[in-house]
Amino acid sequence: MNSYLLFKSLHLIAVVSWMAGLLYLPRIFVYHVENREKKEATDIFEVMEKKLFYYIMRPAMILTWIFGLVLIYLNGIEIFYQLWMQIKIVLVILLSAYNDYLGKCLVSLKNNSNTRSSKFFRIINEVPTIILIFIVFLVIFKPI
């Protein structure tokens, strides 16, 4: 089996898993905020948020980085010096920072110290989609 294709497949699986979490967690936050007066509901949302973040998103993010770096190595380090790849890496760093920010939001919701509205979480829910669009076009077309 071609090791490059194996790692590319593993990278894509990790990316899809991570993106699913990045898109779903803020939506759970919306429901959590809108139901903050209902203890039974918030208890359920807290379990969902915790499991999604710690058991799916964090491992998927780490695997995305590991397999992505392996692909850079297998392609030859020269690929790292191509502008499209540098922009992609910056965008993945932004997604990682966004992931960490969602982790902070998770903690603030758990501690009942959240000051953000459901509208805020609806808006930031679009951030990973926009970044993903740019990454996909960079990887497919390598325009620069």
Predicted regions and their residues:
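Polytopic transmembrane helical bundles with strong interfacial aromatic enrichment
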Residues: 1-144
